[in-house]
Regions:
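Mixed-charge, Lys/Arg-rich low-complexity intrinsically disordered regions
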Residues: 1-13
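Intrinsically disordered, low-complexity, charged/polar segments
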Residues: 52-103
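Short beta-strand-centered aromatic/proline hotspots
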Residues: 26-39
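Tryptophan-anchored aromatic micro-motifs
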Residues: 14-23
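Short, solvent-exposed secondary-structure boundary/capping segments
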Residues: 41-48
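Generic low-complexity segments that are intrinsically disordered, proline-rich and/or Lys/Arg-biased
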Residues: 11, 26, 44, 63-64, ...
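Solvent-exposed strand-loop boundary residues in beta-sheet-rich modules
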Residues: 24, 38, 50-52
Length: 103
């Protein structure tokens, strides 16, 4: 895992995971995952991946977050909009990133 703020890749793909310090209604640590949606205008969203709320989609990301002709999120957009669109309770400099879960 690395800090999201240190990520240099220009795009973040479906299946990527963000680990944050949670607050109510989440556990002490919570993972969020980039998922595909069924909304053609907003094809990617963020879903809770761990704990009691696992499986809940918390946001369908806006079109400006999506990299053209791909199903990926702009890393720069996500860094600039983390607290507005994803999870304001955890500052961006404390968000951890991994490309996907490894089993």
């Amino acid at each position: 895992m690395q800090k999201l703020v240190d990520l240099e890749e220009p795009q973040i793909w479906r299946g990527a995971v963000f680990r944050v310090k949670g607050s109510h209604p989440y556990e002490e640590l919570v993972d969020f995952m980039v998922v595909e949606t069924t909304d053609a205008a907003r094809p990617l969203g963020i879903m809770v991946a761990t704990g009691y709320s696992a499986g809940h989609t918390i946001v369908h990301l806006p079109p400006e977050a999506i990299v053209l002709r791909s199903k990926s999120i702009s890393t720069a957009w996500l860094k600039a909009n983390w607290s507005k669109w994803v999870y304001p309770d955890c500052p961006i400099d404390q968000v951890l990133f991994m490309k996907n879960y490894v089993i």
